[in-house]
């Protein structure tokens, strides 16, 4: 002790890098305890995780103000940061920004649609694009208008916060929720509640990777919930039953009624649809279950490899049982295990139920599904559609995951008027129109990953097929520009993945047949490889005519292709 006192210091106690206590100053010190991101050493995480650790994703507003004031385009780090606010610098495809909104359940008012048209006209390229998450995007926004766009959007009662990078994306619900005669449950309140929960919890803006959630209420139009990380699927129990508590296997009484099944880990770019998790959830508990599952992913997802950071990889590593057990620890009520077979599932969705005129649950009212070719709307069309909704409906609009929109609440007396007006502005409403089944990602015109110009080629392809044949069974054709599958090509009747082909690197597609969602869920199988786009319209014309000639009575295209092997299809369609 004399030696310590003579040196003029206090007796030392510190912590080593491994968390142990030490009396040796050389081994300890606050700066030696390694920083971590949810348990992963900071030295092991990706650069994106380091950026988020240095500054919270929602603390970048001043950066955007600075860039907007200077009219400056962002570097790599700020490109990443600005996406947290819904502004995407899409270089090199376009040296400008794309706005991606958040429109929970795809619900818009006529006034909001007009306001979005104003934003597209004043700051963008005069167009908007309906996305596969029932959302809207506006492109070709200059850097000087970064903040102008977002403040105008907020003035409309909308936001873009968290619509990109490592966040929970736009929350989808059944497109016909609230007016569908077949639905088991109106899912809009769940989508809106989760939307606001996300907006008010900062920790949810620091996920390991993007996250998709959908609520399927059992209506006529498929929500494509099985392509989401979490899909809540409405089911019905016809009579009193008993489930088992996940906590202790104790029996739990279940009164008859509507519940949610929870499906997990849909990620179509990896050829995986969401699978039933074996549990039954009361609607009143759905939001808590969703929040708990997201928190488990937040705390345990991989932050060292962005290619393996989605929920699928955590569940692959742990197994479903452990994932549910970890989620259970965060809940004040027990998970209920219940066999899927004892639930009454919804009937199959109406193929192309998002296109055409359909009766609503409300007497004398109809919804009109509008064909929006590859999701592109001009500002004139946006305003006219808003006018139609306001003048002949209730002023409400719905966007769907099929890249189109619905005008609900149209009285019987005005249906023909609305149909005529749609044709006058270059839009359609016929369920037999092949353009109604086209889905296309942004493509090389606005995305650096895309190998092909998907949207323009989709329109060319649709026009050719419309001219050459008449469909009597609706068919979906999905075009995606790269393996990320933003257009979900593996679940289309016909799926097309863009590739470069030949020595000249011309644009072409791998061709997939037999995909589906919902009650008809399946991952399609690749039949043709690297078909130049110049040959594709003729090939698909031959494919569809062969199907029509050789199918069984009432057989869908998906069923026809599924009952044949790849080699058989290649031979049949090459004749």
Predicted segments — roles?
Residues 2-575:
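Peripheral terminal and linker regions in Fe-S/redox and tRNA-modifying enzymes
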